[in-house]
């Protein structure tokens, strides 16, 4: 079977349409036969047989390498034994044997092109088209992005790294041009239990640069040599596997490769490493001399987190929080009539914070953040408990906390989907809906409340930056002056003043700026004359929101900026700065 389209639906699951994966054609569900005719005629793929031969050669080469490397390993058929939880909470078992070669295709690039007014149906259902005896399959779970479980991709390539021109037969007369897979991918998951030619390319490219993994290599500590090695791997992955890495994303992917090797080594030592995982492990045998990289622990709490949950060992905070959360079924039980009421849910978070105060002093935002962390840990732990893939297993204490969380619904049960009372749009999570209501309908307050002051924010990251800047010690010191900062990006921007770097250049006039934001303001205001902020009291318009706010202060005669040298007052900071210069000149 070959995936050729997606089934799209609206938010109420009342209307369904078919959308072609390779173009913008859509059709009604009842016209599926005409849709298949369109795919066969407009998007004939003539290199299908070539791809199957490449995959067979790739599989044979995998077997030969492993047999030569470790004859003690017993190899059975490929076992894609990962348990994947789909959106309906159903376990999907992916299997393949030596007779039915399978490979996965990434739907990320195709799905991104769908119309915003439509969504994938439940479970991300897709239409399948018969394509001969051989089988291809798209792993829909590859679109889920979680730590060590990022997008899973595939590409037209073999382990022999031959180009398409070397393998493709002459074009058949009378056939339309073959379809091409649109767009590049920017990341993919490294897994030893899924067949993915991109992983093979990565292993081969990484093996050719021992300065990145062999401590005894003479260039192991040579940063220029390591940078050149990263660039070479990025170039090769772009050319051979259609993956456009950044340096940071490449480093994360290589870390995944090391983690998979470490977990496979532990499994081999227990005598349980078989099938596809054993063959990938054999291809990575060169990593035996590399420093051991272990899986990262679950997300760590920092100083900004008020409720510090720890599932690795028994503790009062985690136990009390789970017990308190269980007392508020309106936050997790979809069967209750008040489950969808954003006002009642917000009040429940406040009451939960008040009830939890004898253990930890926290506000409703701290409770909401802790609830989200609990749910993320819960569903990840369930996956690790049920799965046979190469990931870290649950500890005994985690299993005990899992039993305490048995009151929570299964993942994918629409338990966190909430609807806006004003426009019927749906959102995942209370705070996403509350931000929408404030911005789109101008009702209520922004959800993220600072733990130390009354300020509110629309994003978690903005609240954390505010806490660091306003309520924590500034530990980052400038190497050129005595100033210190609480946020790393603030220090980097400040350092540009000392170094004189202005990396952002206007393409129209050549003027340079330290910040991308300043460049955008320059282009929009000077060259495009975009002035989106207009005064309600006069006809003036402004480029920036704060300029409008200062202008309105002038209308209202609000002069809150006062000179420290005299009694002069002003309604904006720029006027005060000009006035200060007059004092300095005197």
UniProtKB/Swiss-Prot annotation:
Keyword Repeat applies: yes
Major location category of this protein: nucleus
Annotated region of DNA binding: 201-292, 320-413
Keywords, alphabetical: Chromatin regulator, Chromosome, DNA-binding, Metal-binding, Nucleus, Repeat, Zinc, Zinc-finger
Entry keyword annotation includes Repeat: yes
Record InterPro entries: MADF-dom (IPR006578), Znf_C2H2_sf (IPR036236), Znf_C2H2_type (IPR013087)
Ranges where the record places region Involved in interaction with Cp190: 161-194, 294-319
GO CC, any one term: nucleoplasm
Consequence of gene disruption: Larval lethal in 2nd to 3rd instar stage. RNAi-mediated knockdown in the eye results in adults with the rough eye phenotype and misaligned ommatidia.
SUPFAM superfamilies the UniProt entry points to: beta-beta-alpha zinc fingers (SSF57667)
GO molecular function: chromatin insulator sequence binding; promoter-specific chromatin binding; sequence-specific DNA binding; zinc ion binding
Record localization: Nucleus; Chromosome; Nucleus, Nucleoplasm
Zinc finger (C2H2-type): 418-441, 448-471, 476-498, 504-527, 533-555, 561-583
Biological process terms in GO annotation: chromatin organization; positive regulation of transcription by RNA polymerase II
PANTHER family per record: BLOODY FINGERS-RELATED (PTHR24379:SF127), KRAB AND ZINC FINGER DOMAIN-CONTAINING (PTHR24379)
Self-association state and partner proteins as the record states: Interacts (via regions flanking MADF domain 1) with Cp190 (via regions between the BTB domain and first zinc finger domain); the interaction is probably direct and is essential for protein function.
Anything else known: The overgrowth of red pigmented tissue in the eyes of mutant flies is reminiscent of 'Clifford the Big Red Dog', a character from an American children's book.
Role noted for this protein: Chromatin-binding protein involved in the organization of active promoters and insulators. Essential for the activity of heterochromatin promoters; primarily binds to specific motifs within promoters of housekeeping genes. May also associate to a lesser extent with promoters in euchromatin. Mediates recruitment of Cp190, a multifunctional protein involved in the recruitment of transcription complexes, the creation of open chromatin regions and the activity of insulators.
Notes on the domains: Possesses 2 MADF domains, the negatively charged MADF1 and the positively charged MADF2. Both MADF domains are essential for protein function. MADF2 is important for recruitment to heterochromatin and may mediate interaction with other proteins.
Name of this protein: Madf and zinc finger protein 1
Organism this protein belongs to: Drosophila melanogaster (Fruit fly)
């Amino acid at each position: 079977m070959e995936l050729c389209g997606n089934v799209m639906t609206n938010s109420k699951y009342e209307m369904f349409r078919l959308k072609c994966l390779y173009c913008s054609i859509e059709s009604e569900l009842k016209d599926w036969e005409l849709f298949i005719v369109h795919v066969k005629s407009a998007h004939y793929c003539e290199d299908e047989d070539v791809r199957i031969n490449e995959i067979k050669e790739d599989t044979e080469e995998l077997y030969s390498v492993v047999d030569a490397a470790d004859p003690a390993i017993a190899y059975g058929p490929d076992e894609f034994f990962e348990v994947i939880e789909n959106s309906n909470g159903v376990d999907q078992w992916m299997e393949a044997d030596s007779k039915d070669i399978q490979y996965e295709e990434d739907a990320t690039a195709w799905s991104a092109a769908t119309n915003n007014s439509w969504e994938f149906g439940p479970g991300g259902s897709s239409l399948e088209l018969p394509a001969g005896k051989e089988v291809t399959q798209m792993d829909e779970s590859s679109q889920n992005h979680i730590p060590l479980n990022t997008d899973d991709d595939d590409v037209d390539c073999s382990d022999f790294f031959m180009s398409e021109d070397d393998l493709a037969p002459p074009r058949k007369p009378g056939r339309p041009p073959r379809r091409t897979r649109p767009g590049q991918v920017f990341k993919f998951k490294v897994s030893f239990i899924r067949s993915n030619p991109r992983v093979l390319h990565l292993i081969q490219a990484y093996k050719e640069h021992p300065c990145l993994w062999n401590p005894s290599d003479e260039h192991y500590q040579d940063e220029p040599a390591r940078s050149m090695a990263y660039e070479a791997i990025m170039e090769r992955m772009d050319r051979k596997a259609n993956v456009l890495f950044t340096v940071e994303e490449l480093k994360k992917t290589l870390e995944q490769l090391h983690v998979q090797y470490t977990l496979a080594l532990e499994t081999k030592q227990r005598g349980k490493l078989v099938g596809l995982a054993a063959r990938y492990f054999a291809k990575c045998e060169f990593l035996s001399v590399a420093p051991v990289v272990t899986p990262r622990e679950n997300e760590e709490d920092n100083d900004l987190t008020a409720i510090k949950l720890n599932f690795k060992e028994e503790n009062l905070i985690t136990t009390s929080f789970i017990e308190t959360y269980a007392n508020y079924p309106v936050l997790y039980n979809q069967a209750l009539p008040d489950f969808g009421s954003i006002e009642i849910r917000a009040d429940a978070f406040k009451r939960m914070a008040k009830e939890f105060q004898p253990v930890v002093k926290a506000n409703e935002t701290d409770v909401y953040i802790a609830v989200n962390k609990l749910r993320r840990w819960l569903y990840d732990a369930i996956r690790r408990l049920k799965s046979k893939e190469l990931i870290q297993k649950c500890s005994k204490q985690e299993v005990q906390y899992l039993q305490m969380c048995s009151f929570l619904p299964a993942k994918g049960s629409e338990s966190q989907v909430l609807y806006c009372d004003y426009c019927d749009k749906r959102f995942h999570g209370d705070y996403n809906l509350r931000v929408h209501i404030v911005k789109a309908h101008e009702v209520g307050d922004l959800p993220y409340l600072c733990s130390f002051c009354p300020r509110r924010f629309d994003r978690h990251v903005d609240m954390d930056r505010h806490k660091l800047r306003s309520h924590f010690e500034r530990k980052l010191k400038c190497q050129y002056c005595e100033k210190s900062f609480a946020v790393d990006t603030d220090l980097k921007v400040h350092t540009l003043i000392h170094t004189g770097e202005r990396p952002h250049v206007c393409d129209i006039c050549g003027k340079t700026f330290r910040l991308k934001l300043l460049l955008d303001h320059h282009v929009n205001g000077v060259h495009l004359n975009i002035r989106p902020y207009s005064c309600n009291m006069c006809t003036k318009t402004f480029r920036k929101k704060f300029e409008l706010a200062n202008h309105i202060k002038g209308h209202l005669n609000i002069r809150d900026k006062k000179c420290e040298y005299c009694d002069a007052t002003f309604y904006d900071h720029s006027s005060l700065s000009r006035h200060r210069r007059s004092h300095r000149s005197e």
